[in-house]
Amino acid sequence: MNEDIRETFHSAEYDEYYAGLDEKTKAKYDYVETIIKTQYVVNTKFVKYLEGTEFYEALISVGTNEHRTIIFSIDSTSFMESKRVLFLNSFLKKSTKQYKGEIETARQILNRYTKGGNEK
């Protein structure tokens, strides 16, 4: 098994969303998180930069459902160079219009973390 090259942290919002998922979906989430932790170069089918933001998104596909998790590289502006990643919030993608609200939610969560820190 590969050694971890990235450490991941979860917000309470992410953990709450994850807790509500079925086992099959949780397994897919865990798989993508393992890739993020162990692969220096992560394929864009798993992580993409969100243009015009400071965030990336993790992509989790389960059947026809497309889940997204907004993530933040704590110690670098580049995801590939990052050693610490924060999973901010997750959602079931319904449309691209939804991203504006989810990005705002991610900013609020990140703001809370930078002001007081409640990493897990």
Spans of model-derived segments:
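Basic, Lys/Arg-enriched alpha-helical interface segments
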Residues: M1-E66, T77-R84, L92-K120
